């Protein structure tokens, strides 16, 4: 890879990309960078590996607590530590384009022959998806991760793209339910719901 192309996944601190290549990066002309939920990368050998390998940079991995999943277990997968570390850095750099990995990649791609870097090969490798911890999808699931990553992503997207401040409630008002709607005009914040969009949730 080179700094003159766009990336789709990177270890923290993520690679920076510019149409002017490394010279553009050095001048701070950053065009694009990536944010990943997890990376199929071995943090000991510093090589690409399968998600069912060892020392993989899963959802709970951070550079200051590499083996969090081994110590804390499945609960650690729910908090998006690696995603947050990468997104916080992306917000600091603030490039015009962010590529977030991933969405709708739920497939178990098994490689029967050894796969990975020279010192990180895995037999019967599940390259991109293996378990809740060792996978990188953001979309909601009925499993243990539920909608945690979706809402974490929404939170960071609002920070990156900008959003109106959350309205603050106005003063308490006593409403006479028989006195008409004009008395609601001073109630803040104003909330308008789409008509007919409430459906049963599973």
Which residues does each predicted region cover?
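Glycan-processing catalytic domains of CAZymes
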Residues: 1-176, 180, 188-191
């Amino acid at each position: 890879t080179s700094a003159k192309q766009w990336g789709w996944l990177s270890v923290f601190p993520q690679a920076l990309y510019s149409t002017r290549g490394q010279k553009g990066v050095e001048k701070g002309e950053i065009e694009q960078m990536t944010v990943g939920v997890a990376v199929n990368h071995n943090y000991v050998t510093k090589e690409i590996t399968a998600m069912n390998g060892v020392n993989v940079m899963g959802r709970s991995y951070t550079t200051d607590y590499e083996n969090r999943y081994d110590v804390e277990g499945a609960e650690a997968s729910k908090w998006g530590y690696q995603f947050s570390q990468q997104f916080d850095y992306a917000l600091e750099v603030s490039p015009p384009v962010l590529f977030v990995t991933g969405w709708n990649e739920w497939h178990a791609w098994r490689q029967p022959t050894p796969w990975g870097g020279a010192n990180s090969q895995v037999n019967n490798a599940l390259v991109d998806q293996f378990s809740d911890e060792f996978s990188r999808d953001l979309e909601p699931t009925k499993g243990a991760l539920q909608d945690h990553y979706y809402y974490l992503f929404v939170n960071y997207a609002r920070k990156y793209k900008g959003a109106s401040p959350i309205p603050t409630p106005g003063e308490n008002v006593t409403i006479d339910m028989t006195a008409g709607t004009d008395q609601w005009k001073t109630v803040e914040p104003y909330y308008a719901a789409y008509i007919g969009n409430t459906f049963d949730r599973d």
